[in-house]
Design a protein with these regions (language model features):
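Short, low-complexity disordered leader/linker segments with a strong preference
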Residues: 1-34, 65, 379-380
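An alpha-beta-alpha
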Residues: 144-207, 226, 318
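Extracellular/periplasmic periplasmic-binding protein-like sensory domains
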Residues: 240-312, 326, 366-379
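Segments of small-molecule ligand-sensing domains
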Residues: 298-308, 319-372
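Extracytoplasmic "Venus flytrap"
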Residues: 32-57, 79-86, 108-109, 173-182, ...
Length: 380
């Protein structure tokens, strides 16, 4: 390669993969609005990313079928971060610099949203996470939003539920590699102990582990009445199965990270009688939820989960904000997203607070006959 060509190539590479300043020229064309999405379509938590993407794609297809937004069709460009650390930063830089997106949707996992959020914030590209519940995500800056509840609320919901069952002695098993799990355990412990409960054992593991017998044996000894397993479905199913093998027959509790068909596929009957908090229930008979389920089934020939519903809501809230802003100019679009109030989504009525977090209810689900069954709704 000749020297001028080499220099040009290096300059281009630096532009795409380094500072990632947003191009000054307007994104898209006169007939389209370009939105980026990053999701874990492959890898360890692919179930989350695939579901979220399906919901997002369904919303975009519906919007385009009805004429688009501001008279323009929406073009969705999706990048797979492969459930890997490091990939979110790479793909988000590409979406901003190469594709010149006007807004960004993603991720489900808090650790991956935390990796991407500083890049979106620096470029002043509004980012909406459908399901990252760790509080630190929106603390990155004023261009970062979420439409799900946060872990301080979710941890409180689980602790209140445990105490409503009369359980005063609990154990905690945390995935130390996931910000989500660490935060959820912390907030559960704070509320549970502040209101008279005792944490009799705290154990940890790392994402990808397969053998949890040592931790479970340590948990069994002080006789807890329930165990919080605050990580993702990828390990929770194995933990449930191994707990039952060790004769631990008390209820396990989890957060929205349990929401995947793979949970029951891995654990089988060992998951029966356990509980987790989530964003919606397919057993809710409200028309908006049943209509969403009907459309999702027709499009994908499967039941939606909460990640699919949150993906749908995130795209619809973004479209609503673009309409209210009357433009895709980043500052005005940011302000319109921040002003979201009483938006009736599939996962509830959504209002964004001053910290750009959604105030909305949670549901408690239990596992019975291999299905997620509704128990109760808990308001903020």
């Amino acid at each position: 390669m000749k020297l001028p060509s080499l220099i040009a190539a290096l300059v281009l590479a630096a532009f795409v993969f380094a500072g990632c300043k947003r191009p000054e020229a307007p994104a898209g064309s006169a007939t389209e609005i370009i939105i980026g999405e990053f999701a874990s379509l492959t890898g360890g938590t692919a179930s989350f990313g695939q579901s979220s993407h399906k919901g997002t794609k369904m919303a975009i297809d519906e919007l385009n079928a009805s004429g688009g937004v501001l008279g323009k069709k929406i073009k969705l460009i999706t990048e797979d971060d492969q459930s890997k650390a490091g990939e979110p930063a790479t793909v988000v830089r590409k979406l901003i610099s190469r594709d010149r997106i006007v807004a960004l949707l993603g991720e489900v996992a808090s650790s991956r949203s935390l990796e991407a959020a500083p890049i979106a914030q620096e470029a002043r590209v509004p980012m909406i996470s459908p399901a990252s519940t760790n509080p630190k995500v929106t603390e990155v800056g004023d261009y970062i939003f979420r439409i799900c509840f946060i872990d301080p609320f979710q941890g409180t919901v689980l602790a209140k539920f445990a105490q409503s069952k009369g359980w005063t002695r609990a154990a905690i098993l945390t995935d130390v590699k996931q910000d989500y799990s660490v935060g959820l355990s912390q907030f559960f412990k704070e509320f549970f102990t502040r209101h008279g409960g005792t944490i009799v054992s705290e154990q940890s593991y790392s994402s990808g582990d397969k053998d949890f017998k040592a931790q479970l044996t340590s948990i069994k000894a002080p006789n807890p009445q329930a165990i919080l397993v605050s990580g993702y479905y990828t390990e929770a199913g194995l933990i449930a199965r191994q707990a039952r093998q060790l004769g631990i027959n008390i209820p396990l509790l989890g957060g929205d990270g349990w929401d995947s068909p793979s949970l029951v596929e891995v654990a089988g009957e060992a998951m029966a009688g356990n509980f987790f908090s989530n964003h919606f229930s397919t057993e809710d008979q409200s028309p908006i939820i049943q209509d969403f389920i009907k459309k999702y089934r027709a499009k994908y020939n499967e039941e939606p989960d909460a990640m699919g519903a949150l993906g749908y809501d995130s795209a619809m809230i973004l479209a609503d904000a673009i309409k209210r802003a009357g433009t895709t100019e980043s500052g005005k679009l940011r302000d319109a997203i921040a002003a979201t109030k009483d938006y009736q989504g599939v996962t509830g009525r959504i209002t964004l607070d001053e910290k750009r977090n959604a105030s909305k209810p949670a549901v408690i689900l239990t596992i019975k006959d291999g299905r997620f069954r509704y128990v109760e709704t808990v308001a903020p």
